A protein has these predicted regions:
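Short, high-confidence coil segments that cap the C-terminus of an alpha-helix
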Residues: 47, 102-104, 131-135
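Catalytic metal- and UDP-sugar-binding loop of GT-A-like glycosyltransferases, i.e.
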Residues: 110
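Short phosphate-binding loop-to-helix
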Residues: 57-107, 117-120, 124-127
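Conserved active-site beta-strand element of glycosyltransferases/polysaccharide synthases
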Residues: 206-209, 216-217
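N-terminal nucleotide-binding beta1-loop-alpha1 segment
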Residues: 2-21
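Conserved core of the sugar-phosphate nucleotidyltransferase
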Residues: 87, 91, 115-203
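A short, N-terminal amphipathic alpha-helix
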Residues: 33-49, 61-62
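Residues in the short beta-alpha loop(s) of Rossmann-like NAD(P)-binding domains
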Residues: 31, 54-57
């Protein structure tokens, strides 16, 4: 990887959670989930700044205790159930740049609710971005169900068909193109694509593949068990 690049890592922690209230600061192994993400970012040794963005007072008051370099108050319009996350990430990057008078080359976001990722996953995703022409990198695990084989959509009249059709029907899942479940563990961008476009996917987006056992994205009480 290019050692002279400036890198920032954000951990965006929204106060509201419909599925699991307060899930971002629920404890796992004795630490709030967002604190685990902060410590993973620090252990990677990749980042010039690790920034936590939140609208939750509890998080804003304690994030720097767990190692964050800076906290950003997430605007109310970016913290509702209907708000997309990417604008909040871009806002955190811009705010940190203004505070530290720095401009970052690579922007990374770690989802607090993906605690099973390891430092090697963060390093691998960043390396994939920096050694290719990718505008962004997502992470995911190979999916067990396939839109070419055993995922269907209901159309007009209630009739169903496979979600994606090929000229020749796929009769074995193994013969279908590989598909992946996004796991939200790591997102990586070249800065301009995040800050100017505020999107995840571009024509040159790549995926860093993780094993299923590290791909948990906590979204229910059952996931904590």
């Amino acid at each position: 990887m290019e050692g002279l690049r400036m890198r920032i890592c954000t951990i965006c922690v929204r106060a509201g959670s419909t599925g699991v209230p307060g899930k971002n600061w629920r404890e796992l192994s004795g630490l709030p989930l967002y604190a685990l993400a902060v410590q993973q970012a620090k252990k990677s040794g990749l980042f010039d700044r690790v920034v936590v963005s939140s609208d939750a007072a509890e998080v804003l008051e304690n994030a720097m205790f767990y190692g964050a370099d800076y906290v950003v108050v997430r605007p109310p319009e970016m913290a509702s159930d209907k708000a997309a996350k990417v604008p909040a990430i871009a806002h955190a990057v811009r705010t940190a740049e203004g505070h530290f008078n720095e401009t970052y080359d690579v922007c990374v976001d770690l989802d607090a609710t993906s605690p099973l990722r390891i430092v090697a996953d963060i390093v691998g995703a960043v390396e994939l971005l920096e050694t290719t022409s990718a505008a962004s990198v997502i992470t995911g695990a190979e999916s067990h169900r396939s839109p070419y084989f055993n995922l269907v959509e209901e159309g007009e009249g209630g009739f169903v068909s496979t979600s994606k059709a090929l000229p020749q029907a796929v009769v074995r899942r193994q013969d279908a193109p590989k598909t992946y479940d996004m796991n939200a563990a790591v997102y990586v961008w070249q800065r301009r694509f995040l800050v100017e476009e505020e999107a995840v996917f571009f024509p040159t987006t790549r995926i860093y593949v993780m094993p299923p056992e590290r791909s948990l994205d906590i979204d229910s009480e059952l996931d904590f068990k």
